[in-house]
Amino acid sequence: MNLNFTSPLHPASSQRPTSFFIEDILLHKPKPLREVAPDHFASSLASRVPLLDYGYPLMPTPTLLAPHAHHPLHKGDHHHPYFLTTSGMPVPALFPHPQHAELPGKHCRRRKARTVFSDSQLSGLEKRFEIQRYLSTPERVELATALSLSETQVKTWFQNRRMKHKKQLRKSQDEPKAPDGPESPEGSPRGSEAATAAEARLSLPAGPFVLTEPEDEVDIGDEGELGSGPHVL
């Protein structure tokens, strides 16, 4: 009987027992992390980070930064000041939505449409204005009914017509008056005298002339009475 007492075979440990020697500490260095190219990291991050309409990325939401996603039914009781909510950062729009945009003439007073009167209506209004500048309410109603107009249209027309009339009066008063010139030659005595003198000047002959005194009148009688000699005038 062969009794061989052999010690049980223990698998040789490939690992050296840990000790506090410097050699053992330096032997078990932590493995360096695998280097990742920056371009690969940027592309992978850009695919997970949403972009705004104008090209600037938002900060990643907590669901992207957290290693383990939260349960959808679980809501956080607090918000970290340096993290954004799941809805992202509220960014105001650069241009307002056309539906909510303020219209340019919203607060401005809308201009009313101008009323166009017919020739017969204008003629009736002008005739009444020549007679009466101001109308009472019953008179306006009566005139509006006769001309197929509303009371407001008649009232507005009379107001504008009075303003136009006042402007015309003011313009006529501001215009300088022409200075009073000499009266016409026919209507004034000086003019008649000047005309007579002009006619007399035209009837005179041209050149110098001498006025002579008239001779004494001589009665011609009988030849004997005058004498025998010749009589010289």
From Swiss-Prot:
Record-linked SUPFAM superfamilies: Homeodomain-like (SSF46689)
InterPro entries on file: HD, HD_metazoa, Homeobox_CS, Homeobox_TF, Homeodomain-like_sf
Presence of the UniProt keyword DNA-binding in the record: yes
GO cellular component: chromatin; nucleus; transcription regulator complex
Positions with biased composition (Basic and acidic residues): 171-180
Superkingdom of origin organism: Eukaryota
Gene: BSX
DNA-binding stretch(es), residue numbering of this chain: 110-169
BP-aspect Gene Ontology terms: cell differentiation; eating behavior; locomotory behavior; mammary gland involution; positive regulation of transcription by RNA polymerase II; regulation of transcription by RNA polymerase II; stem cell population maintenance
SMART domains xref list: HOX
GO molecular function: DNA-binding transcription factor activity, RNA polymerase II-specific; RNA polymerase II cis-regulatory region sequence-specific DNA binding; sequence-specific double-stranded DNA binding
Ranges annotated as biased composition (Basic residues): 161-170
Keywords for this protein: Activator, DNA-binding, Homeobox, Nucleus, Transcription, Transcription regulation
Source organism per UniProt: Homo sapiens
Biased composition (Acidic residues): 213-225
Any Pfam family matching the protein: Homeodomain
Similarity section: Belongs to the distal-less homeobox family.
Coiled-coil stretches: none
Endpoints of the signal sequence: none
Localisation: Nucleus
Record protein name field: Brain-specific homeobox protein homolog
Function of the protein: DNA binding protein that function as transcriptional activator. Is essential for normal postnatal growth and nursing. Is an essential factor for neuronal neuropeptide Y and agouti-related peptide function and locomotory behavior in the control of energy balance.
